[in-house]
Amino acid sequence: MSMQDPLADMLTRIRNAQMAEKTVVSMPSSKLKAAVAKVLKDEGYIADFQISSEVKPQLSIELKYFEGKPVIEEVKRISRPGLRQYKSVEQLPKVRGGLGVSIVSTNKGVMTDRAARAAGVGGEVLCTVF
């Protein structure tokens, strides 16, 4: 059976691993998942990530905790296969008054809502992280 929404699966694996207080979570890799992991690392939500060089590459994400609590409090899928959410640069959502980030897929790559505003581009709002 094929997976309908691989990005939602990635976010769910991260959420479940943090609830179970795991240090590393692995999943099948893709270009989009690697780009989202890079944004999460740049924003300080995860410690690191690696892509294995096997026949079927695996993405391993090293989770980050602060004083025993997960750094990611909430991760939510916004645009989904059944209802895509495209926003212009003016319509990009702010998460918790700017404390969290929206991850946006633009024609210039996957980036945060702040970077998209600075670049003056809109795109598909993939998820929000706080």
From Swiss-Prot:
Disulfide bonds: none
Gene3D superfamilies: 3.30.1370.30, 3.30.1490.10
Keywords: Ribonucleoprotein, Ribosomal protein, RNA-binding, rRNA-binding
Gene: rpsH
Organism per entry: Pseudomonas paraeruginosa (strain DSM 24068 / PA7) (Pseudomonas aeruginosa (strain PA7))
Membrane among keywords: no
Official protein name in the record: Small ribosomal subunit protein uS8
Family annotation (Pfam families): Ribosomal_S8 (PF00410)
Molecular function in Gene Ontology: rRNA binding; structural constituent of ribosome
Subunit structure comment from the entry: Part of the 30S ribosomal subunit. Contacts proteins S5 and S12.
Highest taxon of the lineage: Bacteria
